Swiss-Prot record:
Source organism of this protein record: Rattus norvegicus
Binding-site list for Mn(2+) 1: 65, 67, 86, 254
CDD domains: MPP_239FB (cd07379)
Chain sites annotated for binding Mn(2+) 2: 86, 117, 213
UniProt keyword list: Cobalt, Hydrolase, Manganese, Metal-binding, Nucleotide-binding
Name used for this protein in its record: Metallophosphoesterase MPPED2
Superkingdom per UniProt: Eukaryota
Effect upon mutating residue 252 to H: Increased affinity for manganese. Decreased inhibition by AMP and GMP
One Pfam family named in its UniProt record: Metallophos
């Protein structure tokens, strides 16, 4: 496949033959297509916080998976904050309010947020099925009354919340989606394959910055303990073959913190918490040239 060049014409993504086995998919495409090989695909060193922002650029500050552990995070200078989900433990309204208060004290011009699998109350279908599924698994969430969480997103008064939706700020077209492959029945979990692809098909071409909670296949998605890749194949194909954003920010896999590129799109796993839920991974900054006319 071509690297460094936006896709031309209408591209239709279909379910990948290796969709259900991302580790096998990675091996297959690496061997047969060199899809994850240098020089195009490589790690990107973090930008030091004291690096001057280039003229005519916007600085993005990327974080994810803070899990109600924001008190000790040292936030760097920037223009736009991107948080790609799991800002709470369970999505309890009290947690959301605390997070919103923290956002309110940050100086960024725009703060854009999506949900993750831990924001249970943001997933209406999940909440509707919670009692039927396993009442005792999330007792503090199960005890909530519908009026407590029906409009929980409205508590995020200090940010722009995206859920299968987009916003344009400072000329950048930004799209956010919370969905991840099924994992132990948390919020916004969907089966691999067509169910997730249907969500990725909603991402418009022309998106500059994509925010998802989980990673695409092959980019910061390795789980050492399981010796497995866990990224979504359909998300990778959507990003590389159809949407071609300049920046794809995500989290979800705490072990995958860091930045990579495929020669065109920059991929940032901004997970703040480590695998042991310690909020020690620093925010990642990234500068993009301002769109023409912005």
């Amino acid at each position: 496949m071509a690297h460094g060049i936006p896709s031309q014409g209408k591209v239709t993504i279909t379910v990948d033959e290796y969709s259900s086995n991302p580790t096998q998919a990675f091996t297959h495409y690496n061997i047969n297509q060199s899809r994850f090989q240098p020089p195009h695909v490589h790690m990107v060193d973090p930008i030091p916080y004291d690096t001057p922002k280039p003229a005519g650029h916007t600085r993005f500050v990327c974080i994810s998976d803070t899990h109600s552990r924001t008190d000790g995070i040292q936030m760097p200078y920037g223009d736009i904050l991107l948080h790609t989900g799991d800002f709470t433990e369970l999505g309890l309204p009290s947690e959301v309010k605390k997070f919103n208060d923290w956002l309110g004290n940050l100086p960024y011009e725009y703060k854009i947020v999506i949900a993750g699998n831990h924001e249970l109350t943001f997933d209406k279908e999940f909440m509707a099925d919670l009692v039927k599924q396993d009442y005792y698994r999330f007792p503090s969430v199960s005890k909530l009354k519908p009026e407590d969480f029906d409009n929980v997103q409205s508590l995020l008064t200090n940010s722009i919340y995206l859920q299968d939706s987009e916003v344009t700020v400072k000329g950048f077209r930004i799209y956010g989606a919370p969905w991840t492959p099924w994992f132990n029945g948390w919020g916004f979990n969907l089966p691999r394959g067509q169910s997730l692809l249907d969500k990725w098909n909603l991402i418009p071409e022309g998106t500059d910055i994509l925010m998802t909670h989980g990673p695409p296949l092959g980019f910061r998605d390795w789980v050492p303990k399981e010796l497995q890749r866990v990224g979504c194949v359909e998300l990778l194909n959507t990003v590389q073959r159809r949407v071609r954003p300049k920046l794809h920010v995500f989290g979800g896999i705490h072990e995958g913190y860091g930045t990579m590129t495929d020669g065109y799109t920059t991929y940032i796993n901004a997970s703040t918490c480590t695998v042991s839920f310690q909020p020690t991974n620093p925010p990642i900054i990234f500068d993009l040239p301002n769109p023409q006319g912005s």
